[in-house]
Amino acid sequence: CGRLAQSSMPRIQQVFVESDEADTDAFERALFLARKRSEDALQAHPDFHVVGLSPRLLGYKGMVLPSHLRQLFPDLARPELEARAVVFHQRFSTNTLPRWPLAHPFRRLAHNGEINTIEGNRCWSNARKDVWRSPLLDVAEFDTVVSQHGSDSQSLDNMLEWLLLGGMDLPKAMRILM
């Protein structure tokens, strides 16, 4: 990490959750709801962020150059850790200063660009919360589906995650969001 990143680096903790649930999809939805509940309960704490909570995906978040990833996360150098796919994003700040909460990746995508209709998109997604109900994922207890305070890419990632966990396939979800 550079000096700016180190001076503002949050406390990073990893947790591992084990389940007796044979249905990995159901377990993933349960973890999503647990994460949403914790985010709602701690929304007054702007530094609280859950990078990932999934039986399938492992997330790392850092305000760091690619060449320094192994220093920040030494477990990435372990040969027994293998991945079928990796999403990496190096943020080139356009109109905001680099900050840990804005560092990518988010949970489902990495997006580079400006979404100029962010407020409208957030309102659109929350207005359709009841329209896109899924028997697989009950989000009725939450006031909002997407982050109201994060970056434009974070809100897009929230919406994509919600559609996928609700049972929609990736191509259809992406068509809706584009």
State where each predicted segment sits:
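Conserved short alpha-helical segments that host acidic/polar catalytic motifs at enzyme active sites
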Residues: 1-178
